[in-house]
Curated annotation (Swiss-Prot):
Keyword Repeat: no
Tree of life domain: Viruses
Protein name: Structural polyprotein
Post-translation changes: Specific enzymatic cleavages in vivo yield mature proteins.
SUPFAM superfamilies tied to this protein: Positive stranded ssRNA viruses
Chain positions of site Cleavage: 283-284, 340-341, 635-636
GO cellular component terms listed in the entry, alphabetical order: host cell cytoplasm; viral capsid
Protein purpose: Capsid protein 1, together with capsid proteins 2 and 3, form an icosahedral capsid protecting the viral RNA genome. The icosahedral capsid has a pseudo-T=3 symmetry with a diameter of approximately 300 Angstroms, and is composed of 60 copies of each CP1, CP2, and CP3. CP1 is situated at the 12 fivefold axes, whereas CP2 and CP3 are located at the quasi-sixfold axes. All these proteins contain a beta-sheet structure called beta-barrel jelly roll.
Species in which this protein is naturally found: Cricket paralysis virus (isolate Teleogryllus commodus/Australia/CrPVVIC/1968)
Record keyword Ligase present: no
Pfam assignment, any one: Dicistro_VP4
Gene Ontology molecular function terms on file: structural molecule activity
Length: 895
């Protein structure tokens, strides 16, 4: 017994010395021994709910998510009838504008990350007698892309190409937009302020008119709240409440003297100082033998992550006697059509080196580039949802289906029956001068931007007319499609609209009408030519040869005269938007005639711009048809509203103006072209020059290349800069990810006047991808995407990724740069001076990567120098994401 007592005492003693661990939320207790616990009362019971119901209470528990989901007012201002079309009434950066609210700050204190769906609502306090239309616009990650935002907001076409919604006073008093969080940051960093939701803009789409006088104002309110809130990880650091990145950049530019007078004027005017369709995935580890055996990078799409469906319908070949190899219903061949088609060769080197520079113009086949990555099969995976949607936004049908603002006209009570209010050429080449007085810079739509880079077009075009009216306006319009009639100068006589396909719109029941104009032509294809081009003239008639590129006109006429009650305005504004139909297709990709422009869009005096727009859109001259037509029979009547942007990208299109069904037909490609273009991913695989005539003149010097850099658009009226297909389509998107392929052709010249010859010595190609001293020493010498410098020995001999290439054997210097990036997506920013700064790299504006090309030869400025040109195209794992606007354009210099 005595022995047992000693054992028990020893056991109790060990219990007292044992470490006890307990986790209470964010606090972890570790203590030694037993922790006594007691209660204040012998038996604790919960009070009856009947007892608690005697006072105010509710069943729900208020969490942080509940508080953040409560809408708050972020702005209340006046919309005046003096505010012209395109004026920006309000803008706000998120989540900064929410965090500036004391309640939001209190609830978010103590956390590092915030991720949520942003909901913005705009309300107006309008009267039934007022008419006008507002546009709510959104740009993701806008604070980090100020130069892109400037391009977007220069034109109404650019704004309308972004995610937008309209507020029409005659049918409602509020609109709402739900915005998912899409950013290179998985969470908004509440402590550092990194990773933004983006910016919203409230813009005048149609001028406010108030009663007969046409003057007045209404109050608008902007609400915002968060849904699906996810806050992450506790911290004791304070929440960032400073200025957003674009404000910082403005301050820095002012401090350095780089802020221009024009930018200051815009800053003052816009008051920015105040305030289940397509799922396509990249293949992993594509092998040469699979490509040879199956004519596809993948055996049976076994390498693709999940699945592949497409809005572009698989063709029914019908009575085509022989089917070309590229027309196939196999998923592997469909993947090729969408651009997953040009893998880097991973077979034996000797198999293809006799044609090292082959297939530079092709989107498919094989690429011979040396991989600069550690793995010879390096390739990132593309998954759905990285940009907030499962759609493949590089599918051309997605791009073409986006409605863009195109034109506007006025319908007055004085316009009598048969007055022609508006004509428009049926062509996808929707590119026009900025105004009646500024004719050397151009506005554009998504459809026109694509047509600008092709030879042929065919397919339907969608027209939408939005009537800015009140409930006290009435009248009818006749909208006709007249094939192969253009105008009184080119065409003979007056068209008999009683024989045409038409839609009749009753203003009492419709605020907008949308319809599809089918492709009508005697040839399978028409040319992509701007209808106003000078070479379409013949016999002193402008546009006499227009029938080669335009299928006819859409004409809007008065059927029943506009009637306005005495207490409403005597005219209405009609807005026209255009987009591509379900079968709109292009063929023969080529160089664009017009390129993005970032320069001034005004004359010497910017105050003339309002007068220019008034002149462009005015409808003061009556254009009447004197010949009366017989009784009119409408083919289609009713209220056919516009298909919203999101639904249009899912393949939904409005009814046709006639009765036949519009569908895809692959025969025109099979019979006339020999290939089918369905994706921008195909187009950007074509190599193009991005650095030309670069010269090494100092012994020991090397070329330094920033492979991912895209320079800002030209600011001059005579553009001479190089554009690859990648560069051209870069301006349509907010984000990108993936590898880049670079090819260099180098020639030597022994003295002035001697012929050039291909280099016959080896080259050392090195990749620097770490933001450390060596990288900093290289980037500090760069002022463009391609520059030259003498590499210090300490830089080149420290083990960077190196390839030794002999062009006498391989033809070209060809390398592929991996997407070594800090985040899963990269914002599509542009750099004014060509090369990002170290701060740009730290922000994630570009993957940190510089290539150096060093010749194994002696160089002399007078006796032996080297001239090189650089070409690039994205790798097979590359994707653009989040469709945005189209930039203003300028014609390419050809003198």
């Amino acid at each position: 017994a005595t022995f047992q007592d000693k054992q028990e005492n020893s056991h109790i003693e060990n219990e007292d010395k044992r470490l006890m661990s307990e986790q209470k939320e964010i606090v972890h207790f570790v203590s030694e021994g037993i922790t006594p616990s007691t209660t204040a009362l012998p038996d604790i019971v919960n009070l009856s709910t009947n007892y608690l119901d005697m006072t105010t209470r509710e069943d729900r528990i208020h969490s942080i998510k509940d508080f953040l989901s409560g809408p708050i007012i972020i702005a209340t201002n006046l919309w005046s009838s003096s505010d012209p079309v395109e004026k920006q009434l309000y803008t706000a950066n998120f989540p900064e504008v929410l965090i500036s609210n004391a309640m939001y700050q209190d609830k978010l204190k103590g956390f590092v990350g915030l991720r949520a769906t942003l909901v913005v609502k705009v309300q107006v306090n309008s009267q039934p007698f007022q008419q006008g239309r507002l546009m709510l616009q959104y740009i993701p990650y806008a604070q980090y892309m100020p130069n892109r935002v400037t391009l977007i907001n220069e034109t109404l076409q650019g704004r309308s190409g972004c995610p937008t919604t309209d507020l029409e006073l005659s049918v409602g008093t509020e609109v709402e937009m739900r915005i998912p969080y899409v950013s290179p940051h998985l969470y908004y960093n509440l402590i550092t302020g990194q990773g933004s939701f983006g910016s919203i803009y409230v813009v005048v789409y149609s001028q406010l008119h108030d009663q007969v006088s046409g003057t007045g104002s209404i109050e608008y309110t902007v609400w915002a709240h968060l849904e699906d809130v996810d806050v992450q990880y506790p911290t004791g650091a304070n929440i960032f409440t400073g200025n957003s990145p674009n404000y910082l950049s403005i301050a820095e530019r002012i401090a350095t003297g780089d802020f221009t007078e024009t930018e200051m004027r815009k800053l003052w005017i816009h008051k920015t100082y105040l305030k289940r369709p397509a799922r396509i995935y990249a293949q992993a580890a594509k092998e040469l033998k699979q490509l040879e055996t199956n004519n596809s990078p993948s055996t049976a799409l076994g390498q693709i992550s999940e699945g592949l469906t497409t809005l572009s319908h698989i063709p029914v070949l019908g009575n085509i006697f022989s089917t070309p190899a590229w027309i196939s219903a196999k998923a592997a061949d469909l993947a090729k059509l969408f651009g997953f088609s040009k893998p880097t060769v991973q077979g034996k080197i000797g198999e293809c080196k006799l044609r090292g520079q082959g297939r530079m113009a092709n989107f498919d086949g094989m690429d011979m580039s040396h991989k600069m990555a550690l793995s010879s099969t390096n390739e990132i995976e593309t998954k759905e949802g990285l940009a907030g949607t499962s759609l493949d936004e590089m599918d051309l049908s997605r791009v073409l289906s986006i409605p863009n603002y195109w034109d506007r006209f006025t319908w007055k009570t004085s316009d009598v029956t048969n007055t022609v209010l508006w004509d428009n050429y049926v062509s996808p080449f929707k590119v026009k001068p900025y105004s009646a007085t500024i004719t050397d810079r151009f506005r554009c739509t998504h459809m026109g931007y694509v047509a600008n880079a092709f030879t042929y077009w065919r397919g339907s075009i969608v027209y939408t007319f939005k009537f800015v009216k009140t409930q006290y306006h009435s009248g009818r319009l006749r909208i006709s499609f007249i094939p192969y009639y253009y105008n009184t100068t080119i065409s003979t006589g007056t068209p008999d609209v009683s024989r045409t396909q038409k839609i009749v719109v009753d203003l009492r029941t419709s605020t907008e009408v949308s319809f599809t104009v089918p492709y009508i032509a005697s040839r399978p294809w028409l040319y992509c030519i701007r209808p106003e081009s000078s070479w379409l003239s013949k016999d002193n008639k402008d546009g006499a040869l227009m029938y080669n590129c335009v299928s006819g006109i859409v004409r809007v006429e008065v059927l029943n005269q506009l009637v306005a009650a005495q207490n409403v305005f005597s005219e209405i504004d009609v807005i026209c938007e255009v987009s591509g139909g379900p079968d709109l297709e292009f063929a023969g990709p080529t160089c664009p005639s017009y390129v993005p422009y970032a320069g001034d869009l005004t004359l010497a005096d910017t105050r003339k711009i309002e007068a220019e727009r008034t002149q462009e859109y005015s409808n003061n001259e009556d254009n009447r048809i004197t010949t009366q037509c017989s009784r009119i029979v409408a083919q289609v009547m009713g209220e056919d509203q516009q298909i919203p942007r999101n639904e249009a990208q899912h393949g939904v299109h409005p009814i046709s103006i006639d009765t036949h069904r519009i569908s895809n037909n692959w025969s025109p490609q099979a019979m006339c072209i020999g290939e089918k273009i369905v994706s921008i991913r195909q187009l950007i695989k074509r190599f193009g020059i991005f650095g030309d005539a670069n010269t090494l003149q100092a012994d020991g010097s090397s070329f330094v290349v920033a492979p991912f850099t895209v320079t800002s658009p030209t600011k001059t009226l005579t553009s001479t800069r190089n554009y690859t297909q990648f560069d051209y389509y870069y301006y349509l998107y907010a984000f990108w990810r993936g590898s880049m392929r670079i090819k260099m052709v180098a020639e030597t010249q022994d003295g002035t006047g001697t012929p050039r010859k291909k280099t016959n010595f080896t080259w050392f190609v090195r990749m620097f991808n770490s933001l450390q001293d060596s990288f900093n020493s290289l980037i500090s010498t760069s002022s463009s995407a391609v520059t030259t410098t003498v590499l210090p020995s300490g830089t080149i001999n420290m083990g960077p990724s190196t390839q030794v290439i002999d062009p006498t054997v391989e033809g070209l210097i060809e390398v592929e740069v991996p997407y070594y990036n800090i985040s899963h997506i990269t914002p599509a920013v542009t750099i004014d001076d060509g090369t990002p700064s170290m701060e740009d790299y730290l922000k994630g504006h570009s993957p940190p990567c510089l290539l150096t090309f060093s010749p194994r030869d002696s160089i002399s400025a007078t006796n032996h120098h080297i001239t090189a040109s650089f070409m690039r195209a994205p790798g097979d794992d590359f994707s653009f994401m989040y469709l945005l606007e189209v930039p203003p354009l300028v014609n390419v210099a050809r003198a």
